[in-house]
Amino acid sequence: MARARRVKRDSVTHIYQTCKQAGTCPPDVINKVEQTTVADNILKYGSAGVFFGGLGIGTGRGTGGVTGYTPLSEGPGIRVGNTPTVVRPSLVPEAVGPMDILPIDTIDPVEPSVSSVVPLTESSGADLLPGEVETIAEIHPVPEGPTIDSPVVTTSKGSSAILEVAPEPTPPTRVRVSRTQYHNPSFQIITDSTPTQGESSLADHILVTSGSGGQTIGSDITDVIELQEFPSRYSFEIDEPTPPRQSSTPIERPQVVGRRRGISLTNRRLIQQVAVEDPLFLSKPSKLVRFSFDNPVFEEEVTNIFEQDVDMVEEPPDRDFLDVRQLGRPQYSTTPAGYVRVSRLGTRGTIRTRSGAQIGSQVHFYRDLSSINTEDPIELQLLGQHSGDSTIVQGPVESTFVNVDISENPLSESIQAFSDDLLLDETVEDFSGSQLVIGNRRSTTSYTVPRFETTRSGSYYVQDTKGYYVAYPESRNNEEIIYPTPDLPVVIIHTHDNSGDFFLHPSLRRRKRKRKYL
């Protein structure tokens, strides 16, 4: 019989990760991962009372830790528990006293006559201002270049000798110049001869100023450029009135002569033309097809599809949109009269087949927008206060006009006399501000009548101290409620009591028995 092969168990860490959540971990796996074995407990509780840090005992690899091992033959090591030795320097530092810096005289504090004022010694203070600027120029001598041996060419013939001499190479010269400058904020250097605005170019300087003139420095001017005067900021021109426009911002676009693809919306043979006057057609066209709620977030700029049940018949808000199942997006065009037209192409679902298909005609819904009317220009007045622009008009009530003829003599007998009827008062009497007195006795009481300001006819309020009654004719039908009573009569029974506080009804008294035979 073959012996079963032993399968190696998985690592402890992987077993702990898979079985910890299920709670099926072996005890040895839990103790090893969580460090709760017997050896771990000995080290854990034993290290609390004993310290083996300086002996090099640990669970490392035997390398001596971070600092390594100390050989026995080399100097003494540091013992655990003892105070470390303080390393002192070989030279003792000397203390610097005040005598080395400034001479100080001692004062006897016992003698009261000694002054406590310390005399000041005159010494030259430090110069804080910069002195002379020292300029140092370091010039390095030219080093000697390498020597080049030139070959000498000789010939044995009688011709002249030709010597080829190579030029000596010249090394670059290195010069370093140092410069020191101090900034003085109270001194300003003017680099230009004329403190005006201008532009400089090489040797010929041309200064261009506005209103203050200028100077020309350099060569003579050869070319004269004719300058044009710019108008001042207060001058303006009044333009001619523009012709009437069809839009607020007209754009000149070239007219493209071509044929539009598809069916034209104005084709009356194939598409029904319906003019819409309701302004909801521009913003919310779906409200003309069916009753719905208003959603301010949704903008109807796309095609609207309306689904309607076959058995359900709804009346639209507008009869022109009856049986409309699809309404296209808005299209903008221009009419021959110059108006802007907003169009929407709709499809009706008038007929429905058994298969579910809807058949209907196409409808062109459009609305022409109003044109921009051209108004006459209005002369505007300047803002502000100006003399002679105000007009004061006084009515005839506030002024008196007297017709006086200076040419006539007042004492002349030919003066025309006026009639006395002109002196009569033609004023209509108005009792709107009068008071009404109630009572026939002499000692009457005055009552204040309030006046109500109204645009209607005058109304007055009169106070009556005797009171008044207001009768409102009305009739009420109060139904009488009949409560049901039992058929048996109500019998009140009083018990016989000799106390004498009540009387028993005679019918309730006990009758005496009559005996027929004694």
From Swiss-Prot:
It holds the Pfam family Late_protein_L2. Transmembrane segments: none annotated. A motif (Nuclear localization signal) lies at residues 1-10, 510-517. Disulfide bonds join C19-C25. The keyword Transit peptide does not apply. GO terms for cellular component: host cell; host cell endosome; host cell Golgi apparatus; host cell nucleus; viral capsid. GO terms for biological process: microtubule-dependent intracellular transport of viral material towards nucleus; symbiont entry into host cell; viral penetration into host nucleus. InterPro entries: Late_L2 (IPR000784). Keywords: Capsid protein, Cytoplasmic inwards viral transport, Disulfide bond, DNA-binding, Host endosome, Host Golgi apparatus, Host nucleus, Host-virus interaction, Late protein, Microtubular inwards viral transport, Phosphoprotein, Viral penetration into host nucleus, Virion, Virus entry into host cell. Highly phosphorylated. It comes from the Viruses. It is found in: Virion; Host nucleus; Host early endosome; Host Golgi apparatus. GO terms for molecular function: DNA binding; structural molecule activity. Minor protein of the capsid that localizes along the inner surface of the virion, within the central cavities beneath the L1 pentamers. Plays a role in capsid stabilization through interaction with the major capsid protein L1. Once the virion enters the host cell, L2 escorts the genomic DNA into the nucleus by promoting escape from the endosomal compartments and traffic through the host Golgi network. Interacts with major capsid protein L1. Interacts with E2; this interaction inhibits E2 transcriptional activity but not the DNA replication function E2. Interacts with host GADD45GIP1. Interacts with host HSPA8; this interaction is required for L2 nuclear translocation. Interacts with host importins KPNB2 and KPNB3. Forms a complex with importin alpha2-beta1 heterodimers via interaction with the importin alpha2 adapter. Interacts with host DYNLT1; this interaction is essential for virus intracellular transport during entry. Belongs to the papillomaviridae L2 protein family. This is Minor capsid protein L2. It comes from Human papillomavirus type 8. The gene is L2.
